[in-house]
Amino acid sequence: MKSLEELYNRAIEMKNKGMSDKEISTELHLSVNTVTWLLSKEFVNERSAKDVKIGWRSAGVFGSRIGSLAEIMIDIAEEESNKMNLNIDAFLGITINGIPFATLASYMTGKELIVYRPHPSRKEGFFSSNFASVVNKNVVIMDDVVSTGETMKRTIEDVKKSGGKPVLCIVIASKLNIDEINGVKIRAIMRTVMV
């Protein structure tokens, strides 16, 4: 999508299908606040953007390209685990977009796969029972984009509450200007900065 008008039209289309602002924000890789702002169509009266859309469709359409990104993420995970002198037990994918990276990381390293789904109303999320548990494991959390850090914060809290130890968060792109969330280091392949 190239323009705010296109983003607006896509957001309205999703809203009309019954999606919540949180679900729309996940799909469009925008913060919830930006989606609310977009749906209010206030951008017509404003001159400067308040958010950056991160699109990675060129990589996402082929498994081999996702695999290449996963290899970079694994390399980052191994670098950090060596610095911290600990073993990684599992890779956790945040639904939907973190799952392909965590799946490939699990496959390529022989570590366990955990799937986590955050609850759209900001309550506790849940771990899929079809995959590994977090209990007594050093967990690397993976997602595509971190915008406000809210989903990552809740994921970290839920891993801790469920008996796991979140040791690292890795994303393709971060919109944050911080290096950790809730005491857990966050690494990104790319960072965005508004100038």
Curated annotation (Swiss-Prot):
Pfam families from the entry?
Pribosyltran (PF00156)
Could you tell me which Gene3D superfamilies the record lists for this protein? 3.40.50.2020
Record GO biological process:
regulation of gene expression
Q: Name one GO molecular function term.
A: DNA binding
What keywords tag this UniProt record? DNA-binding, Transcription, Transcription regulation
Domain of life here? Answer: Archaea
Residues spanning the membrane: none
Q: What note about domains is in the entry?
A: Contains an N-terminal DNA-binding winged helix-turn-helix domain and a C-terminal regulatory domain (or effector binding domain) resembling phosphoribosyltransferase (PRT) domain.
The entry sums up its family as follows: Belongs to the purine/pyrimidine phosphoribosyltransferase family. GfcR subfamily.
Q: What is this protein called?
A: Transcriptional regulator GfcR
- Source organism per entry reads Picrophilus torridus (strain ATCC 700027 / DSM 9790 / JCM 10055 / NBRC 100828 / KAW 2/3)
